[in-house]
Amino acid sequence: MFNRKRCLRPVVAVASISLVAGCSVLSDGNSADKGPIIVGTTSAPSTLDPAASWDQSWELFRNIYQTLLNYPVGATAPQPDAAKSCRFTDSSNTVYSCELRAGLTFSNGHKLDARAVKYSIDRIRKIDVNGGPAGLLDSLDSVQAVGDRQVVFHLNKPDATFPFVLATPGMSIVDPEEYSDKAVRKGDTIAGSGPYDLQNYQPGKQAVLVANKRYKGFADRRNDAVTIRYFQDSQALAADLRDKKLDLTFRGLAADDVISFQRNDSKDMDVTEGASNEIEYLVFNPKDPWAGKLAVRKAVAQLINRSAIAHDVYKDTVEPLYSMVPAGLTGHNTAYFDDFGDPSAAKARRFLTDAGITQKVPLALWYTTDRYGSATAKEFQEIKRQLEASGLFTITLHGRPWNTYVEGYEKGEYPVFGRGWSPDFPDPDNFVAPFVGKQNALGTPYPAPEITDKLLPQSRRESDRANVVKEFGQAQRILADDARLVPLWQSKQYLASRDDISGAEQSLDPSSIMMMWELYRKTSW
């Protein structure tokens, strides 16, 4: 996954670790005669409607819908996809114009023109789903369709990052004849214009993608069909890969399985390891009588042992994180370590007693059972152990499947809950802006006027993102002082595949979303 916001980062760097030696290669022919490439993941979509999703549904959207801009392999900035060209037409970065490719259609044959683009963007804001992508468009004033092929975006303030917003799957273009602007689309079919058509969809089970012959864009499809299978636990995911029921896994492999595959227990397996800006963190509900107390939040932040979580639960396949902005991005600091240092029961007790809290604090912690892999349950058991070992907390744990989990936190049902975040684009803005303000990715208002009214607008005037360190340093300090969000770890990205599958190294875009069209079978081995 999610609410989101803006701008720049290096493309995910991936290094392939081959577990097989002595192979001769290969050409990237069409592999339709061997059937679709089968991809397994624990990251199932929550919806098929782009206007309703700011989460990991985007992984599917990227492949079945189209956006004006997208990321070709190796790109660090968005490039035209449905658009032929896009640019700011003024010096203040407030008017952005795109010319569409000629002859665009949706997979159902309906015309995709400037009116459809305007309708799609306006629809997001009109429906305004809680936890949906409307929050990405806070700098947009209006959309204008000029003739059939020109779309002009008028912004209400300078925003050099707006092209990155248009490149997110949240801005997918939909067919006005198929998608009402009064409600979220129901059902298990779509009308898109991406590289693939969704031939069959079984929620929580599988998505069958076949080549969209009407697609016009930059993607050079290297296969004719992909089937994505959705798993509720990592064990079953890894077992099906070993049993050759899958060609590749994306998201959800447990740490033990990653290590096992890397140690070459499967002779015909490749593991691709990549850098990732994905993070996991705790969210505190300010309306809860206990989680709403600053002293309680600070005590939890003081007690969390991130190194133990990374090593004991995730076997060092993740890194401890002490800021909401991950390492490797402009402006990253260690604000939470600076505030709290190493875990300390004595310091945590002082936070509570100074606030007049002398009893054990009862807290309910919630996590999703089927989104981030089976290690999530172990992680929350470890957090429970750490907090209760201090003698300061009594913790109860609760888990729910993702679809109902999202509904719960958007309704404010959870005192404390875990979330993962996959960036919309690799910029510090995208790790601060989505979580603050009246409308955010968490469904829980977080007023932070110093950030939303001053620091973010200042940073968005700056096209050179190396010059925003000061603003995001201050923002991270505010987040640490509030302790409404407590970062836990930053992930690494692992793809495990059969040795006859290639393209994994090129398949991840800058937000670690898989571009299925890059995968193909080796035709000689």
Per-segment meaning from a language model:
Residues 97-99, 134-178, 200:
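Surface-exposed binding/hinge segments that line
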Residues 353-423:
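Ligand/substrate-recognition segments at binding pockets and active sites
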Residues 112-120, 148-154, 194-195, 223-225, ...:
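Alpha-helical secondary-structure segments
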Residues 320-355, 371-378:
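Structural transition elements
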Residues 19, 32, 202, 303-331, ...:
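Detector for C-terminal structural segments
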Residues 213-259:
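Ligand-site clamp/hinge motif
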Residues 167-220, 225:
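Gly/Pro-rich hinge or "lid" segments in bacterial periplasmic/extracellular proteins
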Residues 40-91, 122, 191-192:
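N-terminal lobe/hinge region of extracytoplasmic solute-binding protein
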